[in-house]
Design a protein with these regions (language model features):
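N-terminal/domain-start alpha-helical segments
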Residues: 1-110
C-alpha cells in the first residue's frame, strides 16, 4: 500500500505540481486548500506525512501544527516562503519535523 501524504497548500498551481510529482513517485496524496480543512483531515485521516504551508486562509499553518501536536505525532514538513532563521526556529519549536523554503526542488521532499 502506498504511503499517504496530506498536502495543505492554498496555492493551487503549486499544490497540483507537488501532487503530480508525489503521485509519480508512488505516493497517495490528499489535498486541503486552507488550514481549517487541513487540520480536520489531519485529525480524522491516517497519514504518513503532512506537508503544511504556513500562510493559509482560515487557520494558519502554525496554528494547525500546534493543534495537531496536541493529538497526533504524524511527521510534518512546513513549506513556506519565510526564510528567516527566527521563522524556522519557531516552526521547529512548534513541532515541525522539517522546514523547507519555497521555491524548492521536489527532491527536498522525497
Amino acid at each position: 500500500m502506498a504511503e499517504r501524504i496530506l498536502l495543505v497548500e492554498d496555492e493551487e498551481k503549486l499544490a497540483r505540481m507537488v501532487e503530480l510529482e508525489l503521485r509519480y513517485e508512488g505516493y497517495e496524496v490528499e489535498k486541503a486548500f486552507d488550514g481549517r480543512t487541513g487540520l480536520e483531515r489531519a485529525l480524522t485521516g491516517e497519514f504518513d506525512l503532512i506537508l503544511l504551508d504556513i500562510m493559509l486562509p482560515a487557520l494558519s499553518g502554525m496554528e494547525v501544527l500546534r493543534r495537531l501536536r496536541k493529538e497526533r505525532q504524524t511527521p510534518v514538513i512546513l513549506l513556506t516562503a519565510r526564510d528567516a532563521v527566527v521563522d524556522k526556529v519557531s516552526g521547529l519549536d512548534a513541532g515541525a519535523d522539517d522546514y523547507v523554503t519555497k521555491p524548492f526542488a521536489i527532491e527536498e521532499l522525497l
